[in-house]
Amino acid sequence: QSFLYNVLYASNFFHYYIWNKQNRNRGMYLKRALYLPEVWFFRDGAHRKCDVISCAAPNLSAVQEYRPVSKEENTEILRSRIAFILDIARENEVDHLILGAYGCSFGQKAEEVAEIFKGCIQERADSFDAIIFAIPDRENGNYRKFVEVFESKREYCSYTAG
């Protein structure tokens, strides 16, 4: 659980989400993000502050409603957005980064997302002490694909830079 909603509401960040809904860019959205420092998270009686980056993933599933997007264009947008998120974290001196299967619930293929993450992380290898992918092991196969791309559960679950 977190206070993320409270932070967004209290800080009047909903205009960000409304703007994204009005500017869908064929379902690909645009390269915009919110960096929210020190959001409270609670779990099993413990609490901790973490910074949060909110950035709309390219929604490949929604593309069918709009003009088609080529595979190459989708890949480039996805790569650009993932690099953008990592650069925001680096610029804000985040040392431990927790990521998810970015865009996979919007039709992006887990293997491609993992490959792009791996390449972008390698380009920024000295930027983070640790990167953790928090991906539930469900029937959708996202976890398994990330493990395969990152070659082992240890490297995948707790990728240590350097």
What is the meaning of each model-derived region?
Residues 1-162:
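Macrodomain-like recognition of ADP-ribose-binding/processing modules
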